[in-house]
């Protein structure tokens, strides 16, 4: 539903928002700053709900890294604040009846079951004596997947919103990567990898300067993924591209070949920068790096799973006094460096099935298309499922919630040319304030 926002409404709303931000900044310490940021973001998301995920993912990563000082809890808190602001904005839009109801997807039931299991497993973990803080940490790891799934299905409800969110994501990711690509020691690549397969798909369909621009971005992001020096990201990227090569049609393969050529050209230009050369020297180190203590850590988690294979030891389980090379004696759990070990130790086989069920269902839908936009999202899902064997990001596998949602949401638009998407965005009606909701 599109509702015109007239100028007086915008002026009054902006004045009220400014007054509220001014008031909350008077709160003591970082609480006031966080409250002001939350209110401001809520106002933005109230007008543009499709911006919740791009801002939450990239803005959360950048702002969280700046403010957390290396503390994972602070990093996660920033991301959760942005998502919470989006949730409040969405609730207000529904209350004002300017938001259309979200459609149902085949994965909704599976994601709801995962939320229910997380609640039950948290209660069970507290009942058996697991520490409340550890229960909260483990619950976050599990709940991240369905939370991002439902945020996507409730904010990206139209083709126009999906495209607008994608454009904003690529712009923010491009700015962030351009500023950081020459910084030695920067690892990651997740943000840029999320954009590469969809850009490859677009490059196979567009023509002229639009295609050249998309190829430039895709090649630039691909180089950043290569410089990430993170084997989990490399595995996810390699498997996703392989699936697109094998399953994709002519247009997809054309996009792959053109992106590969663009990546080589971009790499040649970036190699002139000393910072990029320093980062490229870390690639060999990333390949040769040993698993270190992670193997011993995973064996502890698998031992916990072997004792209680069906439902695990409850969220927040931890094994105290374990010797790990380089750490002497330490507590192991509830989060391990292998995501599946985390799942098996905390919620057992039942939890693993509930985690995989909705994701694999979306993959089945996405891989059924040879030239549709669902293919790159499904291919990325497969890549990250494989990488999760030995990778567990501290902020959770949010991509395993977002990608299935994008796969199922775009499946409804199968066969619609990208140019029609772009035309709908560029030629949408503009009201007196220039704002459309």
Model-predicted regions and their roles:
Residues 277, 281-299, 303-307, 311-347, ...:
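Long extracytoplasmic/lumenal interhelical loops at the membrane interface
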Residues 35-46, 83-97, 195-206, 349-369:
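Hydrophobic, aromatic-rich transmembrane alpha-helices
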Residues 2-94, 120-124, 179-186, 384:
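N-terminal signal-anchor transmembrane segment
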Residues 75-87, 106-121, 131-151:
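Aromatic-anchored transmembrane helix interface
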Residues 210, 346-384, 418:
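Hydrophobic transmembrane alpha-helices and their immediate junctions
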Residues 219, 223-229, 245-286, 302-307, ...:
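A membrane-periplasm/extracellular boundary helix in multi-pass inner-membrane enzymes
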Residues 377-388, 393-437:
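Transmembrane alpha-helices of multi-pass inner-membrane enzymes
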Residues 38, 115, 119-124, 143-247:
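Alpha-helical transmembrane segments of multi-pass inner-membrane proteins
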